[in-house]
From Swiss-Prot:
UniProt source species: Bacillus cereus (strain ATCC 10987 / NRS 248)
Family from the record: Belongs to the UPF0180 family.
Name of the protein: UPF0180 protein BCE_1513
InterPro entries, alphabetized: UPF0180 (IPR005370)
Highest rank taxon of the organism: Bacteria
First and last residue of the signal peptide: none
Amino acid sequence: MAKIGVENSLTDVQQALQQQGHEVVTINSEHDAQGCDCCVVTGQDSNMMGIADTSIKGSVINAHGLTTDEICQQVESRI
């Protein structure tokens, strides 16, 4: 399965993606996101960690306003 980076505060999303069989990595900085197929960020500070630019090869999903299920669906559609 895919390697998904999830921002530290999104523990419910981390658990849901792990249950789906994904490798989940907690991202606290831009460096943590490297090598991830996709990253999920809170969007509270949309570019706080520099992840919104091209620092990773995968998609960046802004979790702001989305449910855990909606986030998981977006992850599945982008990997």
